Amino acid sequence: MARYNPFSFTPGPVVFFTTVIYVGLFAALLVTHLTVPDYPSDPPAGINLTEAWADLEHITRRFHPYNSHANDHVRGYLLSRIQGVIATKALDASQVEVIDDLTSNATFSSGATSVYFEGTNIIVVIRGSEDDEPFNSTDRKPNNGGVLVNAHYDSVSSGYGATDDGVGVVTVLQLLSYFTESHNWPKRTIILLLNNGEEDFLNGAKAFMRNPISQVPHTFVNLEGAGAGGRATLFRSTDTEVTRFYSKSKYPFGTVVSGDGFKKGLIRSETDYRVFHGELGLRGLDIAFMEPRARYHTVEDSTRETSMNSLWHMLSAALASTSGLAAVTGEEFSGSESLDNGRVNAGRGSDGVWFDLFGRVFVVFQLHTLFALCVTLLVVAPIALIGLTFGLSKADKNYLLARKAFVYSSDDDNPVQLYGWRGFFRFPIVFVSATAVVVALAYLLVRFNAFIIYSSPFAVWSMMLSAWFFVAWFFSRGADAMRPSALQRMYALIWLFIGSFVLLTIITVFVNNYQVVAGYPALFYFAVVFAALMLSYLELFFAPTKSAYARHFEHDTSSRRNSESASRPLTGSTTAARSDDRPVADDDATETTSLLRGDRRGFTRYGSRRDSTSEGDEDHAQGSRRLDLGNVYPGEQEWSGKLPSWIWIIQLLLLAPLVIVLVGQVALLLTSALYQTPSDGNSPLFIYLAIAALSVLLLAPTGPFIHRFTYHVPTFLFLVCLATVIYNLVAFPFSRDHRLKVYFVQRVNCETGANTVSLTGLDSYVQRIVGELPSAQDQPLNCTTPDVATRKELKTCEWEGLPAKVVPNAAGAAPFGNETNTDRWLEYSIHKGNRSNKATIRVVGLNTRACRIVFDSPITGLAVTGAVSDPRFKPVGAAGSREVRLWHREFGQPWNVALTWDAEEHAKLSGRVVCLWSDANTGSIPAFDEVQHYLPVWAIPSKISDGLVEGFKQFEI
C-alpha cells in the first residue's frame, strides 16, 4: 500500500495549509490592530499611571478650548502639578526651569488668512547633564541641541479632549517626573512644551517659535490624537535617523504609509509637527491616536472611550523615543553652523521606510536602500529567469509552451504532443474576472448604500475577499476540470511575476522622483513571487528530457500499429500522443487502450516514493526498457509525473505569509484612517476601490494553488459573500457606536438680532437630523453647499434657532441670561488714516478672546498693536488676506488693527467684524445643547470652525 504524502500538491494539503496560513495570519493582524497591550503592574521608576489617569480625568471634566474659561482652569491645574513635581524632588532653577509664557505672540499668514495670536504656553526645561551653556545666548554651540516633547492642552469646543490631546498632556507630566529622577537624568536638555491653541490654527506652536528657548531643541516628539483610544501609532517621521529611536519602543506601531497619506492630503488633519519641522527646522516624530474618527472632536473623546492601556502605549513610546534622543551626544542632529533665518540647524537626515511587525518588531531602513533593492531586483530577476530558461532548453527539459517533441528529428511525421502551452492564459482570465467583480461591487455599494463602510468596514472587507476568492476559484477550477495542466501553477506564477514587475517599476519611479515610499510592500511582493517562480523553474529539471519522453512512446506506437484492438490513440488524460493518432481529443483511457503506455498509475500513489530510471538509461532505453514516468495527477501531462510534489508548500510559505503581513498591515491602517472620513466630505468610492485593490493583492498569492481547492471552502465563502452583499446593501450605515458626525455653528447678526443655526453633514442624512430638532420643526430648511472649503462635498441646512446667551448681563453670571442686547456683544470703531488706503479698526468682544475681520476684497498690509515683528512670519500672504483672525490672552480686551489695501482696485474696503464664543459648558449656547439632546442616536455634533457661535456686524470704509 502506497504511503500518503501530507505535503503533496493535492486537494487535502492545499486546502489545509492555505486556509491555516491565511486564517492564522489574518487573525494575528486583527488582534494586533484592535487590541492594546496591557499596562505594566510595575512601571519604571518615576512613572505613576494611577496619577496620570487622575490627571486625565481632571483636565477632561469640561470642554476647554482656548476661547473658554475652562481652559484657564486647566492651565492653572497643570502649573500646580508641575510645581508639585519639582517641589517633591527638591529641584532648583539650575536643573529645571518653568517658563510661564504670557508674553509671546505671533502674526503670520496662511493662504488668504492672517492670524494674530497671543500665546499662553507652559514650558518646562530640564537641563541636560552635559549641557552647561546658557539657553538664550548667541554663543551657544550649534551642536548643543536638546529634545522637545510637545502636547497641547486645549480641546475643541465640542469635545472633552481625552485623546486629543489629554493623553499627550499627562504623558508630558509623567516624562517630567521620570527624567527628574537622578538615575534617569538626560544627557541632552529636554524641553517639555504644553502649548495652548493647537486646535484653532496650530497657534500655540507658532507662539513657541517666538520664545528664545525654541532655538535649543534640535529634535522633537509630538504627541497627538485624532481618534479615541486604541494604539498610538507613529503618524509620520522626518527621517530614518530619528525613527530608529522610536524602534526602541516595546510596542512599536505604524507604517510609513500614514506619512505619505499626509503628504498627499488623504489625511486632512494637521498637527504641530508641521510647525516644528516645516518652519522651525527640527527633526522628529509625530505619535498619535488615529481611530475611530467618528469620536474625534466630539463628546465621545472622553476618558470613558479610552483606557489605561492606551495611555501606557503612548507613554511608553514617548519614553523610549525621548530617552534615546536625549542620550545622543554626537553631532548626528546638528549642522556645522547656526542659521540666520531663525530656523534651527538640525542637520539633514535621510528619507526612511519603516513599519512594524505585529506590534513587536520595528523595521527601519533608508529610502535609497529601498530604491537600490528595487532596481537590483528589477534587473536581476529577469536575467535569472532567462538564464534558467536557457538551462532548461540546454537540458532538453523546457516544457514551457512546448507543443510537441520528436523521436528522431523535426522531420518526424509522428511527433509526440507535450501540451506545454495548456493553461498559459488561464490565470490572467481568472484574475481579471475576479477583480472585475470586486470593482463592480465597489460601484454597487456607492450606488445603493455608499456609507456602509462608516459602521461596517469588516463587512465590506469580508464581501470583497470572499467575492474575489470564490470567482477566482470558480473559473480556475472549472478550467482545470476541463483541461488539466501540470504547468498551471507555474504559469500563474509567471503572470504574477509580470504583474508585480510592472507594479514594482511604477513604485520605483515614485520612490526616485517623488520620494513616495508607501508602495514598499511591492518590493517584498515581487521578491517572494520571483523566489517562488524560480522554484518552479528548478522543479522542471526533475522532468524527463523531451527526447527521452518522445522515445518512451516509440515501442508503444509500433505495437499499436500492429494491433487492431489497440487502434485508439493516446488521449487527453495522458496528454501525450502521436500527432496523427488523435481523432478524439481529451478522451479518457479505456480497456482498449494499450497497457504499455507509460506505466499509468492511479492518483492514490501521487507523491509517494518510486524507483527512478537514470538519465542515461532513459536516453538509451530500447524495446521493453520503458521510461518510468512516476505518478501523474489525473488528467495532467504524463511527463509531469516525476516532478517533486512537495515544492508547492515551499512556494506557498514564500508567497503568502510576507504578503499577508505587509499588505494586510497597510490595509488595516488605511481602513482605520479612511473608513469614517466620508462624514468629512471624502469620497467613499476611493475607499471601496482601495479595499478592492488591497483584497486582490492579498489573495493573488492563492492563484497558483486555487485550482486544487475542493468546493467546501469556496462554497462557504460564497455564502459569506452573499450574506455580506445583502447586508452591505440594505443595512443602515450609522449606529450608536459609529455615529455620523455633523458640524454645528450658530451665526448671529448683532445689528438685527437675527440668528441662524446650521448643521453641515452628508446630504439626505443631515435633513433627517435637522427634522428631529424641536426648534427646526415647521420651519423651511435652506440646504446649500457649505462655505467651508474642506466641506464642499457636504450639505449645510440652516434654520432660525434658539437664541444664544453667550454674553452675561452681569459679571460672573452663569448660566448667562439673554438680557444683553446683541448689539453690545461686539463693538468696533474705524479710524481712517491720512491716505485713502489706510485705516485702523478697533475691535472688542464681550466675554470672548477671539474675533475676526472678514474682507470682501483682500488687504495688502496688516499690523496689530502689540505684535512683534518676526522675519520668519509674513503678516499677509503674497495674494493678500481676506480674513484676519485675532486671539487675546484675556477676555474682553480690544485689538487695534492697522490695515492697508489697494485703493486703485478697490476704492472702498468692506466686510464683517465677527466675534466668536466657544464655551458650551454653562448652557450659554442653547441651540448646541438642543442638538446634543435631540440628535438621533446614530449622529453626533462637532464644531465646524473655531467658534460655536459667531456674532457679526457689517462695516465699510
UniProtKB/Swiss-Prot annotation:
Residues noted as binding Zn(2+) 1 in the record, renumbered to the chain: H152, D164, E224
Binding site for Zn(2+) 2: D164, E199, H297
Vacuolar side: 32-369, 445-450, 512-521, 664-685, 735-957
GO cellular component: vacuolar membrane
Residue intervals annotated with topology Cytoplasmic: 1-10, 391-423, 472-490, 543-642, 707-713
Swiss-Prot/TrEMBL keywords: Glycoprotein, Hydrolase, Membrane, Metal-binding, Metalloprotease, Protease, Transmembrane, Transmembrane helix, Vacuole, Zinc
Cellular localisation: Vacuole membrane
Gene Ontology MF terms in the entry: metal ion binding; metalloexopeptidase activity
InterPro entries the UniProt entry points to: Fxna-like_M28_dom, M28_fam, Peptidase_M28, PFF1_C, PFF1_TM
Biased composition (Polar residues): 564-577
Region (Disordered): 560-591, 603-628
Family membership: Belongs to the peptidase M28 family.
Protein name in UniProt: Vacuolar membrane protease
Organism this protein belongs to: Pyrenophora tritici-repentis (strain Pt-1C-BFP)
Lineage: Eukaryota, Fungi, Dikarya, Ascomycota, Pezizomycotina
